[in-house]
């Protein structure tokens, strides 16, 4: 079995759809997400982010975190391992800002792939 370290990055949007897919494990790949860093670059609005994964190869999502608060100009770190099986998806999206301004959130994940 080969092990490969991967990095994934995402400009986080507000839609709970495929545009929020940060990482998808390949068809014959198992993956361990070591950590997720979610940064709110907005100097005014608190960000609320949602983190979900599939457990069945990409169709049924379950929340790891719902409306997790990231303070202004700050970073939230999820540092416990998340195991993904082949075709599983890691998705991140934000709740819209109350003043209707654009969210300014970035996310980064450190991932170990095993194939």
Predicted regions: what they are:
Residues 1-31, 41, 94-115:
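C-terminal interaction-tip segments
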Residues 32-34, 47, 66, 88, ...:
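A generic structural signal for short beta-strands and their flanking turns/coil linkers
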Residues 35-39:
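Short edge beta-strand/loop segments characteristic of extracellular beta-sandwich folds
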Residues 44, 84, 98:
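Glycine-rich nucleotide phosphate-binding loop and flanking beta-alpha elements
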Residues 44-66:
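Short, surface-exposed beta-strand/strand-loop-strand elements in extracellular ectodomains
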Residues 58-89, 95:
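Intrinsically disordered, low-complexity Pro/Gly/Ser/Thr-rich segments with frequent PxxP/GP/PP motifs
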């Amino acid at each position: 079995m080969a092990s490969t370290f991967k990095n994934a990055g995402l400009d986080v949007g507000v839609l709970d759809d495929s545009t929020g897919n940060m990482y998808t494990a390949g068809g014959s790949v198992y993956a361990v997400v070591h950590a997720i860093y979610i940064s709110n670059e907005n100097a005014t609005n608190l960000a609320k982010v949602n983190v979900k994964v599939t457990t069945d190869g990409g169709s049924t999502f379950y929340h790891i975190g719902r409306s997790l608060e990231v303070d202004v100009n700050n970073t939230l770190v999820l540092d416990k391992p998340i195991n993904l099986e082949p075709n599983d998806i890691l998705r991140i999206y934000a709740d819209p800002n109350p003043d209707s301004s654009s969210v300014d959130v970035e996310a980064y994940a450190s991932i170990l792939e095993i194939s």
